[in-house]
Structure formats: C-alpha cells, structure tokens
C-alpha cells in the first residue's frame, strides 16, 4: 500500500512541480506539498488514495 509522509507539513509555499496525486476527497492535488497542506488543514480526515490524477 502506497503512503505519503506529511509529517513535515504544512509548508507556507509549494513548488509548481507537476506530480499529481489523488486524495480520499476525489480531488487531484498538483503535488505532494499541496496534498499534505490540505491534509494538515483537514484535521486528519483527508487521506491518500493513489498517485496520478483522480
């Protein structure tokens, strides 16, 4: 099972690196930074679904 380590987040600025991944909310995040910031702000309700677009 693939996981994403978000322990270093949230970060104030994300790069524009294009490595999409899909969250449990069925939203495609541009890269790990955007996803992990969303996880941090979701109070643990958002989880990783899979790499690539939803």
From Swiss-Prot:
Q: Which cysteines are joined by disulfide bonds?
A: 6-36, 14-33, 22-54
**Subcellular location, record wording:** Secreted
Start and end residues of each Kazal-like domain: 4-54
GO MF terms, alphabetically ordered: serine-type endopeptidase inhibitor activity
Instruction: Please give the SUPFAM superfamilies that the UniProt record associates with this protein.
Output: Kazal-type serine protease inhibitors
- A family per Pfam: Kazal_1
List, alphabetically, the GO terms of the cellular component aspect: extracellular region
The positions annotated as site (Reactive bond 3) read 16-17
Say where the protein is mainly found. secreted
The record lists glycosylation at 43
Keyword vocabulary terms for this entry: Disulfide bond, Glycoprotein, Protease inhibitor, Repeat, Secreted, Serine protease inhibitor
Q: What is known of its domains?
A: Avian ovomucoid consists of three homologous, tandem Kazal family inhibitory domains.
**UniProt cross-references to PANTHER family, sorted A to Z:** SERINE PROTEASE INHIBITOR KAZAL-TYPE 7, SERINE PROTEASE INHIBITOR KAZAL-TYPE 7 SPINK7
Q: What protein is this chain from? A: Ovomucoid
Q: In which organism is this protein found?
A: Carpococcyx renauldi (Coral-billed ground-cuckoo)
